[in-house]
UniProtKB/Swiss-Prot annotation:
Residues 6-21 are annotated as: G3BP1-binding. The gene is USP10. Residues 417-797 form the USP domain. Its main location: cytoplasm. This is Ubiquitin carboxyl-terminal hydrolase 10. Keywords: Acetylation, Autophagy, Cytoplasm, DNA damage, DNA repair, Endosome, Hydrolase, Nucleus, Phosphoprotein, Protease, Thiol protease, Ubl conjugation, Ubl conjugation pathway. Residues 2-100 are annotated as: Interaction with p53/TP53. The modification N-acetylalanine is found at A2. GO terms for biological process: autophagy; cellular response to interleukin-1; DNA damage response; DNA damage response, signal transduction by p53 class mediator; DNA repair; negative regulation of canonical NF-kappaB signal transduction; negative regulation of stress granule assembly; protein deubiquitination. Residues 132-159, 306-335, 555-596 are annotated as: Disordered. It is found in: Cytoplasm; Nucleus; Early endosome. Belongs to the peptidase C19 family. USP10 subfamily. It comes from Bos taurus (Bovine). The keyword Disulfide bond does not apply.
Length: 800
């Protein structure tokens, strides 16, 4: 007895018929009883998901691939074994049965990314499930039903329903998927259907014949493999398959077709879940990120603009309006007057024609993002917010506070924080870390209230405001853990630095106050920046003092000379002579005259301000002395004899001869000059002058090791004669608390880092921009080839 097995008979087709009906990668012929979709074409098996094996039959070849009996039969696949491409309903433009809106939820419509052809709907699986089940049972059993069916002309499921129910007014189809047409849907979709609109994954879908291979033509290849969890979950499905939405993990809902909407964009590129807080990424095309525009259209001429925000709200993205240059018909319905196309014409070329819906190829013209106006706007806000102290209502409060302030030198244990350097700001970051480690500077800024933009929209003290904000970035450090014993006798201390931040408000001060440091091409110098800070804070505090004493002439910001004589009988008229020229004392044997520049005290001068006395000795004349203020003490280290900081200090006060000086009578005289320390500040900053300017205009760096102690004692010989016996040893002894290093051998480049003493750790920290690590005291004072000490910060020990 012959074994009754399913037989599949295919007719002889001419080459033209074969090319029309069977040459397409997206066409699928589903054969019973195996239920596996047979994909045709060279690209069919390339993009299948893992774990799925599909039977492949190639037409027009001599060898027939025998099917495997182990292919499972699942009800998830609909069977269409009576496909006859020569049926008249597939060649002529027949209409489908009219669907009601209630049928939307029963069927799944897929908008093919490469088969968007308007025209009559072509439903290949319009038959009822009962009819399909009967056909499947007949095919399996091979009984009488199958023999009777062989005698009949093969008709597709639902063929007679076309003749019975087909009529005018049938909706036009949107697309064919795998050679099948989905149910037509009215253009008006309710709110419930809109909420159900989701994504149709295509990561594992075979590419259509003639579809663009490059990702720049379309974004279907942009996502990584496995990026779309719903891609081909259970293998290939026909358009008429009834299947629920993907699982909760993918959070994608079934997508009903809606003409004229952005369904193609959603089909080609799967969107992430709605619950994310980050920007929705659709894919990368030519290095740009195409962002989801929610309900935006994908019509012709609509561009996908790059959205730069990384914390955009998805709800805002859904409500974003379409671009202004989008045509009005983009979000409307499909034009009704479309040329009718035959079923066979769909397989000639999947590239859209000029008359087809312009949703296959989305124009992604790259528009470079505009320069972020964040910095410029903030900078403009600060400039516009600058007002005179007389127009600043908060200025009088700060002035009264600074007038009665008492400097606090008590050490404070702050949690260290690195400073992010996104530009060439290392010389600023290094200086800021040293100032934060200065206790009186920290306490002074913490005494001034921190005002918000709402509380103080206009300011007359931008530098004070910025440093008050900087000091408030640092908080008290938690109690440090006990030192733990490491290998050997070394003590290892742990440090927990806070999060690094970028002090952009400090950087903007360079342009707001129009400092010369902001000029392009200038050497970035940490000592010059320190002077810029201290002088700027000092001048703002002087302006605040004017509010309390508006008629006080001494508060003028001037370095003009003021004559002061020890012997009032010999006092000269004020304003006679100039501070810049040598003043010759009268021939009578009287006490020398000391000339002093106006230097009004502020809290900044109370911390960093000192005085040096410059005395000029002239033959046959008495001494002429001038008092000059300083914030940093300049130490010349160019001589080969200078190896330590003490050597540089002694060289500073050494008597030097001045050649070529002439009097008013054009007579050359021999003079000499000596500098001594008149007043020592609580915080002494020593500047090792490593950058030497040549006569040709160039600049070179002195790379030599200068030894500096942790405890520095200022010798009595360095002091002025009038203050030698007034300063006790405790007033002349300092302790190192910060070192600013310069790295590199070039005077016009390099890098800056800082070592600071941490009182809570009772040790040293090395801060390189945002990097913070613990170092030993020996590492701080030990010379190194890669770095040289540039600024030394000392505190008086009697104030510790």
């Amino acid at each position: 007895m012959a074994l009754r097995s399913p037989q599949y008979i295919f007719g002889d087709f001419s080459p033209d018929e074969f090319n029309q009906f069977f040459v397409t990668p997206r066409a699928s012929v589903e054969l019973p009883p195996y239920g596996g979709t047979v994909l045709c074409g060279a690209q069919a098996a390339d993009d299948l998901p893992d774990g799925h094996d599909y039977q492949r039959i190639e037409f027009g070849v001599n060898e027939v691939i025998e099917p495997s009996d182990t292919l499972p039969r699942t009800p998830n696949y609909s069977i269409s074994s009576t496909l006859n491409p020569q049926a008249p309903e597939f060649i002529l433009s027949c209409t489908t049965s009219k669907k009601l809106p209630d049928d939307i939820d029963k069927e799944v419509n897929y908008s093919s990314a490469n088969c968007q052809y308007p025209g009559p709907a072509l439903a290949l699986d319009g038959g009822s499930p009962a009819e399909a089940e009967a056909l499947e049972n007949d095919g399996v059993s091979g009984g009488l039903g199958q023999r009777e069916r062989k005698k009949k002309k093969k008709r597709p499921p639902g063929y007679y329903s076309y003749l019975k129910d087909g009529g005018e007014g049938g909706p036009s189809a949107e697309a064919l998927v795998n050679g099948h047409a989905g149910p037509a849907v009215s253009n008006s979709v309710g709110a419930e259907d809109t909420d159900l609109m989701g994504d149709v994954p295509t990561a594992g879908t075979p590419r259509t014949w003639g579809s663009p291979q490059d990702a720049t033509d379309f974004v279907s290849d942009a996502g990584p493999a496995g990026a779309f969890p719903g891609a081909l979950d259970g293998g290939a499905r026909t358009a008429g398959q009834l299947e629920g939405c993907p699982g909760a993990d993918s959070e994608a809902s079934c997508l009903p077709a809606e003409a004229g909407r952005d369904t193609l964009l959603r089909t080609a590129v799967a969107q992430p879940s709605v619950g994310t807080d980050t920007t929705e990424n659709l894919g990368v095309t030519n290095g740009q990120i195409l962002e989801s525009l929610g309900e935006g259209t994908a019509a012709n001429g609509v561009e996908l603009h790059t959205v730069e925000s990384s914390d955009s709200d998805p709800a805002k993205a859904e409500s974003a309006p379409p671009p202004a240059d989008a045509p009005a018909s983009a979000a409307g319905t499909v034009p009704a007057s479309q040329p009718a196309k035959s079923w066979a014409s769909l397989f000639h070329d999947s590239k859209p024609s000029s008359s087809s819906l312009p949703v296959v190829s989305v124009e992604t013209k790259y528009s470079p993002p505009a320069t972020s106006p964040l910095v410029s706007e903030k900078q403009a806000e600060v400039k516009e917010g600058l007002v005179p102290v007389s127009e600043d209502p908060v200025a009088i409060k700060i002035a009264e506070l600074l007038e009665n302030v008492t400097l606090i030198h008590k050490p404070v244990s702050l949690q260290p924080r690195g400073l992010i350097n996104k530009g060439n700001w290392c010389y600023i970051n290094a200086t800021l870390q040293a100032l934060v480690a200065c206790p009186p500077m920290y306490h002074l800024m913490k005494l001034i209230p921190l005002y918000s933009k709402v509380q103080r929209p206009c300011t007359s003290t931008p530098m004070i405001d910025s440093f008050v904000r900087l000091m408030n970035e640092f908080t008290n450090m938690p109690v440090p853990p006990k030192p733990r014993q490491a290998l050997g006798d070394k003590i290892v201390r742990d440090i927990r630095p806070g999060a690094a931040f970028e002090p952009t408000y400090i950087y903007r001060l360079l342009t707001v106050i129009k400092s010369s440091l902001s000029e392009k091409g200038r050497q970035e110098d940490a000592e010059e920046y320190l002077g810029f800070i201290l002088n700027g804070l000092h001048e703002e505090m002087l302006n605040l003092k004017k509010l309390l004493s508006p008629n006080n002439d001494k508060l003028t910001i001037s370095n003009g000379p003021k004559s002061h004589s020890v012997n009032e009988d010999e006092q000269e008229e004020p304003g006679e002579g100039s501070e810049d020229e040598w003043e010759q004392v009268g021939p009578r044997n009287k006490t020398s005259v000391t000339r002093q520049a106006d230097f009004v005290q502020t809290p900044i001068t109370g911390i960093f301000g000192g005085h040096i006395r410059s005395v000029v000795y002239q033959q046959s004349s008495k001494e002429s002395a001038t008092l000059q203020p300083f914030f940093t003490l300049q130490l010349d280290i160019q001589s080969d004899k200078i190896r330590t900081v003490q050597d540089a200090l002694e060289s500073l006060v050494a008597r030097e001869s001045v050649q070529g000086y002439t009097t008013k009578t054009r007579q050359e005289v021999e003079i000499s000059r000596r500098v001594t320390l008149e007043k020592l500040p609580p915080v002494l900053v020593l500047h090792l002058k490593r950058f030497v300017y040549e006569k040709t205009g160039g600049c070179q760096k002195l790379i030599k090791n200068i030894e500096y102690p942790v405890d520095l004692e200022i010798s009595k010989e360095l002091l002025s004669p009038g203050v030698k016996n007034k300063n006790f040893k405790c007033h002349r002894t300092y302790r190192l608390f910060a070192v600013v290093y310069h790295h590199g051998s070039s005077a016009t480049g390099g890098h800056y880092t800082t070592d600071v003493f941490q009182i809570g750790l009772n040790g040293w920290l090395r801060i390189d921009d945002q990097t913070v690590k613990v170092v030993s005291q020996q590492q701080v004072v030990r010379p190194a080839a890669e770095r040289t000490a540039y600024l030394l910060y000392y505190r008086r020990v009697d104030l510790l």
